[in-house]
Amino acid sequence: MKKLPDSELEIMLIIWEYDRPVTRFEIESKLDEDRKLSPTTILSFLSRLQAKGFLEVSKDGKNNVYSAIIDQESYMQAESKNVLKKLYKNSVKNFLAALYDGNNLTEKDLQELEAYIEEKRQKQ
């Protein structure tokens, strides 16, 4: 699965948030005020996402409606694995060390991580 540029990911996040087929107008209304895009730019992103296999397009009257083919969880898992592979040599330990050594993990984060690991161990 290909990594999406930030602009296309922003569009996909909106579509995933709706969790149903959406129109360009609905996408446009959800974009940040600071980041207003022209209708043609949005349509261009939607066309690219369709070409990449992320979206399918159907008609609802005169309007095109866009549905996600790839769900958010699948994309996030693939991207997480890609980041882990590229930046941390597939090492979860190296990834966590970077977070911890950079003071990006709070005590609460560590407790949640311990609880998650314990839950995974019990399921094995």
Where are the predicted features?
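Short alpha-helical segments that sit at the start of domains
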Residues: M1-Y18, S74, K123
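Short, cationic-aromatic polyanion-contact patches
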Residues: L4-P5, D60-E79
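Short amphipathic alpha-helical elements of helix-turn-helix/winged-helix folds
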Residues: I14-Y18, K30, Y116
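Short acidic, hydrophobic short linear motifs in intrinsically disordered regions
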Residues: P21-L31
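Short, hydrophobic-biased segments on the C-terminal half of alpha helices
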Residues: L43-S47
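Glycine-centered, phosphate/nucleic-acid-interacting loop/turn motifs that mediate DNA/RNA or nucleotide
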Residues: G53
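Short beta-strand "wing" residues that participate in macromolecule-binding interfaces
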Residues: V57
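Amphipathic alpha-helical dimerization/coiled-coil segments
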Residues: A78-R121
